Curated annotation (Swiss-Prot):
InterPro entries the record matches: CRISPR-assoc_RAMP_Csm3, CRISPR_Csm3_endoribonuclease, RAMP_III_fam
Additional facts recorded: Encoded in a type III-A CRISPR locus.
UniProt keyword Nuclease, yes or no: yes
Lineage: Bacteria, Bacillati, Actinomycetota, Actinomycetes, Mycobacteriales
Protein's recorded name: CRISPR system Cms endoribonuclease Csm3
EC id: 3.1.-.-
A GO term for molecular function: endonuclease activity
Biological role stated in the UniProt entry: CRISPR (clustered regularly interspaced short palindromic repeat) is an adaptive immune system that provides protection against mobile genetic elements (viruses, transposable elements and conjugative plasmids). CRISPR clusters contain spacers, sequences complementary to antecedent mobile elements, and target invading nucleic acids. CRISPR clusters are transcribed and processed into CRISPR RNA (crRNA). This subunit has the target ssRNA endonuclease activity; it cleaves multiple sites in the target RNA at 6 nucleotide intervals.
Keyword check for Ribonucleoprotein: no
Assembly: Part of the Csm effector complex that includes Cas10, Csm2, Csm3, Csm4 and Csm5.
Keywords: Antiviral defense, Endonuclease, Hydrolase, Nuclease, RNA-binding
GO biological process: defense response to virus
Group of enzyme by EC: hydrolase
Homology family: Belongs to the CRISPR-associated Csm3 family.
Length: 236
């Protein structure tokens, strides 16, 4: 199946379909400044998507689905289904998850500018009205513009053992790896049907994954297994 140690990299494109707002924090803002700026790469100043945002959202969505399947409500991450903890980790068991979500960088800046984009973000004005006093509260929300494409990268580590078991000196079976990739594909599909970032119930944060492909980045992987893993990803 594999060598004694392996890392499988999943790459693809994450496309923003509706304005994306992943905030850079609630620090001090000068009068007239945007209330909620987006997070940016500190060097290029281009918009980025933190791996923490992707990991947290996918884990939450998968936990809900596993809970619905087993009629269980998981109140805390450490109470998640064993399969979820195997992929994302368990702090109480001191177990690192098999998945590593990378920060994603904008890749089509030149294309967006060629298509007429003056800036890579937009400022959307929103107004909350107090029902009692009718007082307005105008807010400025910075959003990554639709059509922005980001280089998606996720690393799956072939590791040992599962939550609640002793760490065994044996690699997971091919069936277990395929099961994990099925869960990864379902998590990404659930994200497409949900939203990333804030204000998703108001239309923000719809995204789409494309060109997903798995490859053996470290170690050897049987060709037939790799084909099956890519078949799972094709379902997204």
């Amino acid at each position: 199946m594999t060598t004694s140690y392996a890392k499988i990299e999943i790459t693809g494109t994450l496309t923003v379909l509706t304005g994306l707002q992943i905030g850079a924090g609630d620090g001090f803002s000068a009068i007239g400044a945007v209330d909620k700026p987006v997070v940016r790469d500190p060097l290029s100043r281009l918009p980025m998507i933190p791996g923490t945002s992707l990991k947290g959202k996918v884990r939450t969505l998968l936990s809900r689905q596993y809970g619905a399947d087993t009629e269980t409500f998981y109140r805390k991450p450490n109470e998640d289904h064993a399969h979820i903890r195997r992929l994302f980790g368990d702090t109480e068991e001191y177990m690192t998850g098999r998945l590593v979500f990378r920060d994603t960088k904008l890749t089509n800046k030149d294309d967006l500018e060629a298509r007429g984009a003056k800036t890579l973000t937009e400022v959307k004005f929103e107004n909350a009205i107090n029902r009692v006093t009718a007082k307005a509260n105008l807010r400025q929300m910075e959003r990554v513009i639709p059509g922005s494409e980001f280089a998606f990268s996720l690393v799956y580590e072939v590791s040992f053992g599962t939550p609640g078991e002793e760490q065994k000196a044996s690699l997971p079976s091919s069936d277990e790896i395929i099961e994990d990739f099925n869960a990864i594909a379902r998590g990404l599909k659930l994200l497409e049907l949900d939203y990333l970032g804030g204000s998703g119930t108001r239309g923000y944060g719809q995204v789409k994954f494309s060109n997903l492909k798995a490859r053996a980045a470290v170690g050897a992987l049987d060709g037939s297994l790799l084909e099956k893993l890519n078949h799972e990803l094709a379902a997204v």
